[in-house]
Amino acid sequence: MIRKLKFSALGVALTCTLAALSGTALAQSTIFNIPSTDVVAKKKTYFEFDFIGHLESDKNGGFQTYVPRVVFGLPKNVEVGVNVAATHSAAPAIVYVQPNIKWQFYANEKAGTAFTAGAIAYTPLKDRKTIDSFGLLYANGSKKFSGDHGARLTLGGYGVVDYDGAGANGKKATKGGVMVGYEQPLNKKVSFVADWFSGNNALGYVTPGFSFALPKNGLFNIGYSVGNRAKKNNGLFVYYGITF
């Protein structure tokens, strides 16, 4: 059981959600797990609540992770935010605070391209002597293809700083890799979306699912995360986001 970058409980719930629909006017900071090339607009706020769970009893490896997150848009295409990820399982509860920053340093709407770079810090609220603090650095780019149903493809790379955890199979964790995202509008309100972090670490998951545009700048995503390694390293992933 890994938790999103965290390591344990589905990669601390997929690293507690690093947490954009190409087919809508909405922008979100992540697809499912990987960062998108979107940033929150200046003076806007994005709020999101994630649930990630392996739907078995705790004694059989089940867990539930809850992740509220808020992101603020700043000048010069910069956003800053914070996530709080709490995981319940048979093991002691894990709570991570994750301040983060992203900079969209290039965007060409006509060409459908954008590039971003960012960083996320992961710090446990308790048990700091036994649970690692670490950081994530990344850069990525995206290409939005033309047409009413034009897909967006995102490619990038990441590195984990000061992380000494084991991989999902008990072997030494990898400290870097690639990330891939795909967003395919099906109609004006629904898109098929998927993303993947390579690596044998808390980030190493593939998550396919669907994204639904809601009224008043809302968004609902539902998918299923499957770990790159280990049995039962998977979980339902649901989130709601809104920009205001």
Question: Which residues does each predicted region cover?
Answer:
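Cleavable N-terminal export/targeting peptides
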Residues: 1-31
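Transmembrane beta-barrel domains of Gram-negative outer membranes and organellar outer membranes
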Residues: 26-153, 157-165, 183-191, 195-197, ...
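Conserved phosphate-coordination/catalytic loops
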Residues: 61, 172-173
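Solvent-exposed loop segments that connect transmembrane elements
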Residues: 166-171
